[in-house]
Swiss-Prot record:
Name of the protein described by the UniProt record: ATP-dependent Clp protease ATP-binding subunit ClpX
Description of how the protein assembles with itself and partners: Component of the ClpX-ClpP complex. Forms a hexameric ring that, in the presence of ATP, binds to fourteen ClpP subunits assembled into a disk-like structure with a central cavity, resembling the structure of eukaryotic proteasomes.
Disulfide pattern: none
Residues reported in the UniProt entry to bind ATP: 121-128
Gene Ontology biological process: cell division; proteolysis involved in protein catabolic process
Summary of the function given for this chain in its UniProt record: ATP-dependent specificity component of the Clp protease. It directs the protease to specific substrates. Can perform chaperone functions in the absence of ClpP.
Keyword Protein biosynthesis found: no
A GO CC annotation given for this chain: HslUV protease complex
C-alpha cells in the first residue's frame, strides 16, 4: 500500500518555472525533461509584448525627425514660404507623435488628429510641399483631384476611390496604408455653389464635402480587393483612416474678396488704418483668413472644423522664381543641364535669362508651375537638333532668347569641324 501511494505522488507533475502542480493549473505543457504551465506562458507573452512595444516606440522615436529637421529638408526643395513650412513641420511631427502615443495602452488622454489645409495662389508650392513631406517621412503618398469626385452612386469617382488608389500604391499592405499621407488638390472647387437650397442636387459640391467628412475625421472604409468593382457577397478590404494624415489644398480664387469685405467692415472709425485695395496683395489677405471666411466661400462648417491647421502660402515674386529655377536640389535648370550633359553639351543659362523666364511666368500668372513650359519652348529646336549634330560643346541661353524668341548660341567643340560657318554665325547673331 505505501508503495502505491509513493508511485501516485511520483506521477504528479510540476511546472519547472513556478513549481505549481498539474492540479493547480489548467494546462501543463511538457518539453524535454521540463514542464511549463499556462500561467507562465501568459506571463512570458506579456513580457515579450511589452518589450516589443518598447522597441517599436524607441524605433519610431529615433526615426521621427524633429520639426526643425523637417523644415530644413523642405528648404532643400521648396523656396520661401517660411511660415507654412514651420506650420507643416509642427503639424506632421505632432501627427506621427500622436500615432506613437496611441500605441501606448492604458493612457486615458486621447489625442485628436490635426489635418492640414494649404491656401495659396496657383504655382506657389502646395503640392510640392505635400510630396516632399511624404518623401522625407518615407510613408505612402497619394494625390487626388477633388474636381473628379462625386457622391456615391453618380457618374464619377467616389471618395473611397482615394483609399483604393492608396492601397494600390502600398501593394495592398493595409497596415502601411493606414499611416499614409493623402493630398486632395483643388478642394476649393467643391465649394457650395450657392447659399440658397436648390431643387437640383449638388453632387460634386456640398455632396462631396459631406462624403469627405467621415473619411478625413477617421472611419473604416470598405474597398474592393485588387481594385475590382463593388458587388454583393464579396469580401472587402477594411482600411481605418484614423491615422491617415489628410492635407487639402486650393487656390481659393475669390476668397480674398471675402476676407477684404470682412476686414474693411471692421476697419471703420478714427483709429482705422486706411489702405488702398491695391496695396494689399493676395498673400497678405490670405494670411488673415478665418474659419468664417472659408464657410462663406462655400465650405461646410463641419469640414472646416476638421481641418484645424490652415497654412497660407505667399505669392511668388520675381526673385523667388529665380531662386526656384536654380537653388533646389532638383531645380529645373539643373534638370535641363543634366539632359544636355547626356548629349555631351554644357547648358549655360545667363542671369538675364533667369530673370526673363521669371518675368514671363509672372505675366502668365502661372507661378512656379509655368516655368518649365517657358524653358521647354526656348530650348525646343536646340533639343531637337542637338542629338544629330553631336559636336556642340556648349549651349548659351540669354535674355533675348526668352524675350525675343531668338535661338540659343551654339558653341562647337572644334571650329574646323563645324558643319557650316555661315549658319553658325547666324545662330550667334540671333542670340546676340
Amino acid at each position: 500500500m505505501p508503495d502505491k501511494k509513493g508511485s501516485a505522488d511520483a506521477k504528479v507533475l510540476h511546472c519547472s518555472f513556478c513549481n505549481k502542480s498539474q492540479h493547480e493549473v489548467r494546462k501543463l505543457i511538457a518539453g524535454p525533461s521540463v514542464f511549463i504551465c499556462d500561467e507562465c506562458i501568459d506571463l512570458c507573452n506579456d513580457i515579450i509584448r511589452e518589450e516589443a512595444q518598447a522597441t517599436a516606440r524607441a524605433a519610431i522615436r529615433s526615426e521621427l525627425p524633429t520639426p526643425s529637421e523637417i523644415k530644413t529638408f523642405l528648404d532643400q526643395y521648396v523656396i520661401g514660404q517660411t511660415l507654412p513650412k514651420r506650420m507643416l513641420a509642427v503639424a506632421v511631427y505632432n501627427h506621427y507623435k500622436r500615432i506613437r502615443h496611441g500605441e501606448i495602452k492604458g493612457d486615458e488622454v486621447e489625442l485628436s488628429k490635426s489635418n492640414i489645409m494649404l491656401i495659396g495662389p496657383t504655382g506657389s508650392g502646395k503640392t510640392l510641399l505635400a510630396q516632399t513631406l511624404a518623401r522625407m517621412l518615407n510613408v505612402p503618398f497619394v494625390m487626388a483631384d477633388a474636381t473628379t469626385l462625386t457622391e456615391a452612386g453618380y457618374v464619377g469617382e467616389d471618395v473611397e476611390n482615394i483609399i483604393q488608389k492608396l492601397l494600390q500604391n502600398c501593394n495592398y499592405e493595409v497596415e502601411k496604408a493606414q499611416r499614409a499621407i493623402i493630398y486632395i488638390d483643388e478642394i476649393d472647387k467643391i465649394s457650395r455653389k450657392s447659399d440658397n437650397p436648390s431643387i437640383t442636387r449638388d453632387v460634386s459640391g456640398e455632396g462631396v464635402q459631406q462624403a469627405l467628412l467621415k473619411l478625413i475625421e477617421g472611419t473604416v472604409a470598405s474597398v474592393p480587393p485588387q481594385g475590382g468593382r463593388k458587388h454583393p457577397n464579396q469580401d472587402f478590404v477594411q482600411v481605418d483612416t484614423t491615422n491617415i494624415l489628410f492635407i487639402v489644398g486650393g487656390a481659393f480664387d475669390g476668397l480674398e474678396k471675402v476676407i477684404r469685405d470682412r476686414t474693411e467692415k471692421s476697419g471703420i472709425g478714427f483709429s482705422a488704418s486706411v489702405r488702398a485695395k491695391s496695396e494689399r496683395g493676395v498673400g497678405e489677405l490670405f494670411s488673415e483668413v478665418e474659419p468664417e471666411d472659408l464657410i462663406k466661400f462655400g465650405l461646410i462648417p463641419e469640414l472646416v472644423g476638421r481641418l484645424p491647421v490652415v497654412a497660407t502660402l505667399d505669392e511668388l515674386d520675381e526673385a523667388a522664381l529665380v531662386q526656384i529655377l536654380t537653388e533646389p536640389k532638383n531645380s529645373l535648370i539643373k534638370q535641363f543641364q543634366k539632359l544636355f550633359a547626356m548629349e555631351g553639351a554644357e547648358l549655360d543659362v545667363r542671369p538675364g535669362a533667369l530673370k526673363a523666364i521669371a518675368r514671363k511666368a509672372l505675366k502668365r500668372k502661372t507661378g512656379a508651375r509655368g516655368l518649365r513650359s517657358i524653358i521647354e519652348a526656348a530650348l525646343l529646336d536646340t533639343m531637337y537638333d542637338l542629338p544629330s549634330q553631336g559636336n556642340v560643346s556648349r549651349v548659351v541661353l540669354d535674355e533675348n532668347v526668352i524675350d525675343s524668341d531668338g535661338k540659343p548660341l551654339l558653341i562647337y567643340a572644334d571650329e574646323a569641324a563645324a558643319p557650316d560657318k555661315p549658319a553658325r554665325s547666324q545662330v550667334r547673331g540671333a542670340a546676340a
